[in-house]
Each structure stands twice: as C-alpha cells, then as structure tokens.
C-alpha cells in the first residue's frame, strides 16, 4: 500500500474526516474504549438556542474541545453531556417582540399557557444552526442526550436543591430595595447587574435642591439645606436628609442663582468651591443686583454634622403625606464630601442605603396603598409616576423607557419644540419655586438591564433570597483552591466579587422559567418548600383529604399549571404557590446535579462526575455561570463545583472593536470554516493569543496559519510520501538503533521528545497557546527548515540502505508524533495525517488519532548537549543569514570565513562539533574563533543610567564619566565578567554587562551581528575563486528549475549543454563541472560556442543559453 500523495485542501479535510468519524462512530468509541478508566469530568455551560452562534462561540468551544480530547488521549474517560439553557428573560423578550405584546398583555391578550408554549417553541429556534456549527468545527459533545432546562426532570432536581437551601435556612423572603428592570418587569440579581456592559455612561439632569428649614429660632426664615441628586424623579419621595456626623458644614448667606432671592444655605465646607466663586467671597451682599454675574456669599457659621441631626424641614414636593413624622436630618455613614453638597437626599423607596438609614432613624417611606391595602411607591412597576404625583401622573421617570413615537406624543402634549424629560421638568418646577440652587447635565455610570439595555430602578420588592452572605467566607476560601486561567481573574474579578457578596435575589416576576417551589399561607405564617414531584403528589393528596380544592395535574412543572395547585399547611390553612419564578442563572448553576436528574437517578454517575475537573466559558460568566456553580456547590456541599477553569477573553474585530451587526464587522463562523477549514480557524484562534486575552480576529491571520504551519507540515509529509513510495518504505523494517543513526537524526528525535514534554506540560497546565506554538515552531523551524532541508540528499540519493531507512523512520516518527500532539487543536487535519501514515505502516492498532494514546517522553532519546550544540548551529546560521540579507549577498555565493568570539571552552567545543554543519548551511569555507572582537568591531559604551541610578544615585554622574572613558580592552573585560571601575576618590564600583549599553560598528570588509550572547563576524570580501563557485551554484539552481519545468523525475539522468558567455562564467563552469553534474544528476556538461535550440535563463545581470536532455 502506498502513502497518500493527493493534494490536501484544508477546507475539504473537515468534511472528509467528519464523514469518517460519523461512519466509524469515532466520538462514541473515544468514550466507550476508555470505560473503566479514571474519569475526567467536563461541564458544558449551556448555550441558549434562541439566538444564532457567532465566531466567539468557535473560540470558546475550541478551548473546551482541546482539553477533552487531550485527556481522552491520556487515557481518561471523558463524557461530554451537551445542554440547552431554555428559560429566562432572553426568551421571553424575544417572544414578546415577535407577538407584539408587553408583559402586561400576558393573561389578557394571550393566556399564560399559550405564552409559555410560544417560549418553548422559540427557545429551540436556532438549534439546527448550533448543531451544524458544533459538527463543522469538530466540537465533540453529546448532542443525542443533552440536558434541557425546561424538562420536568431538570426542574425537579432544581427544586431538590432549593429545598436543601430552605432546610438549611439559607432561603428567605424579604421586602428590600432591589435592582428592578421596568422594561423586563422583574427584579434582577447583583450578578446580573454586574454583567459586562451593564453599567453605561449616561448624561442625566442633576439638581441641587433647596430644602427649607421649618421655623427654627436658630436660623433665619429663608434658610435651606442643599442636597444634590442625579435622579430628580425621586424627589417627590424624599422623607429625610442625611449628613455625616463628623463632616464640617457651613451656613452661607447668598442669593439663589435662578430667582435672585436672598437665601441662607447649609452645605459641606469642603464643597463650597463647587457652588461659589472665590472671587465673590469679598463682594458686598448689599450691593448685589439681580442678574449680576458674580453672586456674593458670606460664611456665617460652621457646624459639625451631628449638630444638624434632628433639624426639621418642609416637604419639598408635597404630593403625598406620610402617616408618621418625617422630613428631618438624620446621620448616614455613607455620606461623603467627594461630590454633591455633603448632604444626601433620602428616598427610602428607591435606594438600599436610603431605606437602611431611614429604618434605623424611624423615618417612614412616602407610599400609597392599593385597593387591597398593599403599600407601593410613587412609581409603578412600569416605571411611571402614580396618580398621586399629579403634575406627572402616568409619565415614565426615565426618558429611555419611551419609544420614539411616545416621546413625540409627549412633546406635543407638553406644547414644546423639544421633548423634556421628567427630570428636566421637575428641575424647572423647582427653579420657579425657589427650590433649586443648581441644575446641570451630569455624566455618570448607571446600571442597565442586561437584556433590555434599559436603565434599572432601585425599587422596593417582596423577593426571595439565597443568603449567600452567610457562607461568604467559605466561598472565598474555596475559590482559592481553584486553578483559574488566568490567575488574575480568579484572584481579582471573581475573588473581589466574592469579597463583596450580597444576598442572591432569586425571585423573577415572569412566566417562562422554573417556578419557585414554595407554597405559603395567605398570612405568611406557614410555608412549605417542595423538593420533588413525589412530595408534591403527597402534599396534593393531603390537601384533597383536607377538603381543599386544588389542581392535580403535574405533567408540566411550569406556570400556569403549578399556580393552580393549592396545598394545606400543618395547621390546616390553604397555601398557594409564591408566584415568582427563579433566577435563570440558578438553572444553569444547577446543571452538575440536574443534568443527571440527581438525586432521583444516577447517583453513582453523579458522584463519579462531581466536581468538574474543567470548565471554560467567556470572562462575562465570572459573575454569571461561574458564580452560580460555585455558590450552589459551596453553600450546599462545601465543595468547589470545578477544579480548573479558563475564562476566555472577547473576540473583537481586527481593529480591536466589538463585533456588531449594526456596524457590519461581524465575522460569520460558517463562512469562515467553509472557506479556511476548521483546523486553520481553530489553530489561528488558539496560537494567536492566549484564550483569556482578547483576540483581534483577522482573516489574514488564518491565511498565514494555512501557509506557514499547515502548508509547511503538508509539504513535509508530501516530501516523505513521495520518496517513501519510491523506495516502498512501509516501516516494516526493525527500528534502526539510536546509536546507529546520524547526529541530525538523534538531534531531531531529542527535540521531538522535548516537544512531547513541553506540549504535554502545556496542555496539563491549561496553556493551549504554549502547546500550539511549540508544535508550530518545531514543524517550521526544526523539522522542515532544518532537519528535512539538511537531509534531503539522504532521501533521494544512493541505494536503499540502513542510513536511508533511519532517515525514513526518523521523519515518520516526527510526523506521527506531531499528528498526536496537534490532534486536540486541529482534530480533522491531524487525524487525516495520522491515518495517511498509519494505513501504510499499521504501527498503531487504532483507526483514528483520537483513539490513540498521547505520546510519552522517551528519556533515552533525550540529549540535552546535542540539542544545545544544534541550537548554536541554528543561531549562528541565522545570524550569518541576517548579515547576508543586509549586505544583499545571496546564500549561493560562498564566502571565506566567519569569526566567532568565544570565551567559554565548553561553548567553543560545542560549536566546533557542528562546524561542518554551519559551513554547509551558510556557505562559508572556515569558522575561526577569537577571544575578543576588537579586530572586526569598533565598540562604544555608555552607562545604563536607569539601573545604575537606583544603586548609586549620588555618584551617577561621576560613574557615567568614568565609563565613557573606558578602553576597548575594558569593554571586552565587562563582556567577559565583572569589571572593577575605579573612581577618582578610590571607590571601586563593580560593573557588569547589565550596567552598560555596548554598541558595535563594523570595520570595512567585515559585517557583524549579535543576538542572545552570540556574536558573529562575516568576512564579506569576495575573491575570484569564490565568485566562480557562486556562479556554479547559480547554474545548479537554474538547471534544477529546468528539470522541474520538464517534469523530470528525481532519478532521471540528464545531459547539460551551455553556450559560452564571458571568461569569468566559462571559467567558473569548467572549474566546477563535477560539482554541477553531481548536484543535478547530470552525466555530462558541455560548453559550446553556439546553441541554437537552447533556453534563455536569467542569472544576475547575465543571460545564459542552456539545454538539458534526458
């Protein structure tokens, strides 16, 4: 059987190999054949199929796939259960948009049952596209039996976990101020509020309001507290003002800048400069006239904040009176003088700090009541003022809540040329009433809903919470045991998040999601948390026995079915389910348990696959899935949910901008894979930058990967296949002992073992970029550009002997090992490479590289000394090539010698051992060694002021002058070792090469290059003999090109005829006739006066006429 020599198209390899995988069930076998082996557990973070996949999903799934494939090849059994995240706000908002309804229409225009059915259908809308991408990119995950979060079994496991929280008294109900999204109609958790991009810079109207003091003998009648707010819409709900007890405040006599009325105002002394010009300090109050540009002011008195506590003031906007006394100054521990006035306006219904300090001080909230006696604030859950706020009743408090049509209608209603927001009109109202001291636009960062992109409100809600604060310290400690990649994300972003943890708001006032399994009596005195379907059946039976009318259908655990189930309390009271759903992030965080329907089934399976050895998702999941996994596992089971995690960075466009359909810079993953192939796409994404860094995705980068890495690897394989087929090499012979192989064989095999170690270590440390780059460097620099190039003649010259067999075996081993090492990153191409080799040699008893074992280091093949000297040969050759390029002297032109300054005997011996190799590689006649470079280089030296300055600051100038005067031999001494620099006062300063900057200038006739401690001087003088030899090498090159153009086989012998040119060329051809014939497989070379049927070939500035005949 022959090795495959067909040209390989990367774009087609994926389809070909995928068909092979399907036909042979390779993925299934990769799991089944490891049965009984140690397990490696991977958790798939469930995507939602209600949106299409993007190029960033290719990145994320490649990272996941790499380590699952690697661990499988290491012998672990790696089950990869796929999953779908099917509940929550994203689905509901999409359905509302498609149906043209809002949340308020559900239950009116459409039943809850119909609505949820639409959600169930919508959530799998793009499943086929996700499945297609999964297959195309080679992501191995079980799509046949995925977990789906809307299925009853999954929900039942979630209920079990919630009951665990409830029994541990970690689940409670509280009436608190929570982030609330009017656009979505539900409260949000703190981790939802901290998703990337939720805080946006906005330009709002801010106002410094004047709160008039009630009659007080210590103050004038026109005295006001100044309090600043960026949310003027909350001012109708003001019921207190907060000061810092130890902050210094001042009473200032001045004039209102809008009404010009005389006022006395109180504010923090430290913030005077924000409102008063220093130039106006000495102006006369009596001389002030309305409209004067500078408003005079005078400080009358100062107070500590604690002296102001208890002072009462008039209600600023008296739309609704509280039932108990309010409107007085209280102390607040959060008050500062960083901005504002040092006095904080307190609206307990719209701020957590406000509610806390108001409660401590006995200050009531400004609330009204509905028909059932339930209290609610002056803004409804759609974000509109209630009827009590008569001037603005029914108006949205945030401009962003209005559509363009609604805004235009409101403008017309206002009778204005331009729409003015509620904040703007409240500010105008205050100005006119002498109740505003300063109104301006203010840019600040404000939280927005992660799904609607609309501003949130801080709103009083009855919500269920998981008491994460009770386990905060333990969650912090457990996090320290997790291997985060990068570490900074675990310590910083995630660690800081845990350090500042607040209780988890679990409640969602929506319809499509996992219902909260808590039933409560109407008075709230009794409740039951249901943890299983069986338990629910038992409780329904109890309710029926107690004579309570209840639904009994529990085929579907969603709303509205569970809403109709009424249970009975222990004391006989009816209990209805709390109507909330739970946070969708709890759904995904429950997947380690719910994917197996634990604890109702698969207990052993769960125990063997918990916690996860590895997970990976985008960095945005730090406060999403990563957190919920960690919180549930840590709080309930005192364990981490995952041991190793990669937090992927963003995939940006090539200019570093976020991809956006609106901008038009989105890269289509399907088109990319179809055009470039999945392997090149994956390899580019992994090797371009570590996965946790942001990737500037550039299609040109994939093209470069195709050319440089896959092109080089394929050419190397094609070279091997061509000659192996000619010689019928099938690896049937016994392995040639290492000691009997050439030094270059032993070197590349040693480098291969070093590569195996480096790649295995990189994969094991979750460093795929290091692994990919190491493989790439080996293939391009060591295997192709060095080993194959230097050993070409062994493959196509001479008889099929032991040396040739060794060359074939060595190159085969390298190719096969590279296929195994690269398989996790480039699964299609590496499987084809492996199969193309193995179908001939039959060396491996498996049909796919993904069923093979990962290579292990063979210590016997490692030779550090050999690797070192070959590395020296490569580095020296590279320096000489760089000089040739700079001097425009081609490699085919021989040169006489190089000089290498060497001070260490071991280093000299190592270079001498590879002298012949260097000479052949860079086309020179001799390598000579010198102990310094003074004969070929002029050196200059100057101090490294940055380094020396840290140690000898005071003496730096003197040291600098002394260094500048050093001689050539002194500079050489510094390069060799530590040099003692003596100053005028006798002080001795040790100087190393790090303390100075040494620069070189070439001497005519020589050219010098240095890199990494190696210096090479090249003699660039050309003698006639060297010129002639260069001409001969050029002729060999042109003959080889003609052979190729004629389609001659490697073994074909030829006759060469060349028309004479000038004396130099004729002499060169005659003197080097034997060399030319040997190199070109020619049995003769003839020079003739005239060649009528020859072919013209260009050679430098000459034209040669030559003919070759078979």
Curated annotation (Swiss-Prot):
Signal peptide: none annotated. Its cofactor is Zn(2+). It holds the Pfam family Anticodon_1. A motif ('KMSKS' region) lies at residues 658-662. Its EC number is 6.1.1.5. Monomer. Catalyzes the attachment of isoleucine to tRNA(Ile). As IleRS can inadvertently accommodate and process structurally similar amino acids such as valine, to avoid such errors it has two additional distinct tRNA(Ile)-dependent editing activities. One activity is designated as 'pretransfer' editing and involves the hydrolysis of activated Val-AMP. The other activity is designated 'posttransfer' editing and involves deacylation of mischarged Val-tRNA(Ile). This is Isoleucine--tRNA ligase. It comes from Cytophaga hutchinsonii (strain ATCC 33406 / DSM 1761 / CIP 103989 / NBRC 15051 / NCIMB 9469 / D465).
């Amino acid at each position: 059987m022959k090795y495959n020599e067909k040209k390989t198209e990367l774009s087609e390899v994926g389809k070909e190999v995928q068909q092979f995988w399907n036909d042979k069930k390779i993925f299934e076998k990769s799991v089944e054949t490891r049965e009984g082996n140690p397990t490696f557990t991977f958790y798939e973070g469930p995507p939602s199929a209600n949106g299409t996949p993007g190029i960033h999903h290719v990145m994320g799934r490649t990272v996941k796939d790499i380590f699952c494939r690697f661990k499988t090849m290491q012998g672990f059994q790696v089950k990869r259960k796929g999953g779908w995240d099917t509940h929550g706000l994203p689905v509901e908002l999409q359905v509302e948009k498609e149906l043209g309804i809002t949340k308020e229409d559900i239950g009116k225009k459409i039943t809850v049952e119909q609505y949820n059915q639409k959600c169930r259908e919508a959530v799998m809308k793009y499943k086929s596209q996700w499945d297609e991408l999964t297959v195309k990119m080679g992501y191995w995950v079980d799509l046949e039996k995925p977990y789906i979060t809307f299925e009853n079994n999954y929900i039942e496991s979630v209920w079990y976990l919630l009951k665990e929280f409830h029994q541990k008294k970690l689940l409670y109900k509280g009436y608190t101020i929570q982030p609330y999204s009017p656009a979505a109609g539900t409260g949000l958790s703190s981790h939802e509020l901290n998703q990337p991009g939720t805080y946006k810079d906005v330009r709002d109207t801010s106002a410094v309001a004047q709160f008039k003091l009630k009659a007080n003998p210590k103050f004038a009648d026109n005295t006001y507290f100044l309090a600043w707010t960026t949310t003027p819409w909350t001012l109708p709900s003001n019921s207190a003002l907060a000061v810092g007890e130890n902050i210094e405040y001042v009473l200032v006599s001045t004039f209102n800048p809008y009404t010009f009325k005389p006022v006395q105002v109180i504010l923090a002394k430290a913030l005077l400069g924000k409102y008063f010009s220093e130039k106006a300090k000495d102006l006369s109050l009596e001389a002030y006239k309305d409209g004067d540009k500078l408003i005079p002011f005078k400080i009358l008195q100062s107070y500590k904040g604690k002296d102001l506590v208890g002072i009462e003031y008039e209600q600023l906007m008296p739309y609704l009176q509280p039932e108990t006394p309010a409107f007085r100054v209280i102390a607040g521990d959060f008050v500062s003088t960083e901005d504002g006035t040092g006095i904080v306006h307190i609206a307990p219904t719209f701020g957590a700090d406000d509610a806390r300090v108001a409660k401590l001080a006995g200050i009531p909230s400004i609330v009204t009541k509905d028909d059932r006696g339930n209290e609610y604030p002056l803004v409804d859950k759609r974000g509109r003022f209630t009827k009590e706020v008569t001037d603005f009743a029914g108006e949205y408090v945030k401009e962003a809540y209005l559509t363009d049509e609604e805004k235009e209608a409101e403008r017309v209603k206002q009778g204005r040329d331009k729409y003015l927001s509620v904040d703007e009109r409240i500010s105008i109202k205050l100005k006119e009433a002498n109740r505003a001291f300063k109104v301006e636009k203010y840019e600040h960062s404000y939280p927005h809903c992660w799904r609607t992109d609309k501003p949130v409100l801080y709103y009083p809600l009855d919500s269920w919470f998981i008491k994460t604060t009770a386990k905060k310290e333990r969650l912090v400690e457990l996090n320290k045991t997790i291997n985060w990649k990068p570490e900074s994300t675990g310590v910083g972003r995630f660690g800081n998040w845990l350090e500042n943890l607040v209780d988890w708001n679990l409640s969602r006032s929506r319809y499509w999601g996992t219902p909260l399994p808590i039933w409560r009596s109407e008075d709230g005195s009794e409740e039951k948390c249901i943890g299983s379907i069986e338990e629910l059946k038992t409780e329904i039976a109890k309710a029926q026995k107690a004579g309570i009318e209840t639904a009994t259908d529990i085929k579907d655990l969603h709303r509205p079915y569970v809403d109709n189930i009424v249970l009975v309390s222990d004391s006989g009271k009816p209990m209805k389910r709390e109507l909330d759903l739970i946070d969708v992030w709890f759904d995904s965080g429950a997947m380690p348990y719910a994917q197996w329907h634990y604890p109702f089934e698969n207990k052993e399976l769960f125990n063997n696959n918990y916690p996860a050895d590895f997970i990976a998702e985008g960095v945005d999941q730090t406060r999403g899935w990563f957190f919920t996994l960690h919180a549930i596992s840590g709080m309930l089971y005192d364990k981490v949910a995952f041991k190793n995690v990669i937090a992927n960075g963003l995939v940006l466009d090539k200019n570093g901008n976020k991809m956006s359909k609106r901008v038009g810079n989105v890269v289509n993953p399907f088109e990319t894979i179809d055009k470039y192939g999945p392997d090149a796409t994956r390899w580019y994404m992994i090797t371009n930058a570590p996965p946790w860094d942001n990737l500037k995705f550039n299609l040109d980068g994939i093209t470069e990967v195709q050319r440089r890495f896959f092109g080089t690897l394929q050419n190397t394989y094609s070279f091997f296949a061509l000659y192996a087929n000619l010689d019928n090499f099938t690896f049937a012979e016994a392995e040639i002992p290492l000691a009997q192989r050439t030094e270059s064989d032993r070197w590349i095999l040693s480098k291969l073992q070093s590569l195996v170690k480096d790649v295995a270590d990189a994969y094991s440390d979750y460093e795929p970029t290091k692994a990919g780059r190491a493989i790439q460097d080996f293939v391009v620099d060591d295997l192709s550009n060095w080993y194959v190039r230097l050993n070409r003649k062994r493959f196509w010259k001479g008889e099929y002997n032991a040396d040739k067999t060794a060359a074939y075996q060595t190159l085969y081993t390298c190719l096969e090992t590279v296929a195994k090492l690269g398989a996790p990153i480039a699964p299609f191409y590496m499987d084809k490479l492996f199969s193309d080799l193995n179908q001939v040699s039959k060396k491996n008893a498996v049909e796919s590289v993904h069923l093979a074992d990962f290579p292990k280091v063979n210590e016997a093949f490692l030779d550090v000394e050999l690797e070192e000297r070959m590395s020296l040969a490569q580095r020296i050759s590279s320096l000489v090539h760089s000089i040739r390029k700079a001097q425009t002297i081609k490699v085919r032109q021989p040169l006489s010698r190089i000089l290498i300054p060497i001070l260490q005997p071991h280093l000299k011996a190592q270079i001498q051992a590879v002298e012949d190799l260097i000479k052949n590689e860079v086309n020179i006649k001799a390598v000579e060694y010198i102990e310094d470079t003074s004969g070929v280089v002029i050196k200059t030296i100057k101090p490294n002021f940055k380094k020396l300055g840290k140690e000898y600051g005071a003496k730096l100038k003197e040291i600098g002058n002394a260094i500048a005067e050093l001689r050539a031999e002194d500079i050489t001494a510094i390069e060799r070792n530590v040099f003692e620099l003596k100053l005028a006062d006798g002080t001795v300063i040790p100087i190393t090469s790090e303390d100075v900057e040494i620069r070189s200038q070439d001497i005519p006739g020589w050219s010098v290059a240095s890199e990494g401690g190696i210096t090479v001087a090249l003699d660039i003088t050309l003698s006639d003999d060297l010129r002639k030899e260069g001409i001969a090498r050029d002729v060999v090159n042109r003959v080889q090109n003609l052979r190729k153009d004629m389609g001659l086989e490697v073994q074909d012998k030829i006759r060469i005829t060349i028309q004479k040119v000038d004396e130099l060329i004729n002499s060169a051809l005659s003197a080097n006739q034997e060399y030319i014939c040997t190199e070109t497989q020619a049995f003769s070379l003839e020079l003739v006066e005239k060649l009528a049927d020859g072919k013209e070939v260009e050679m430098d500035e000459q034209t040669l006429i030559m003919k070759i005949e078979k």
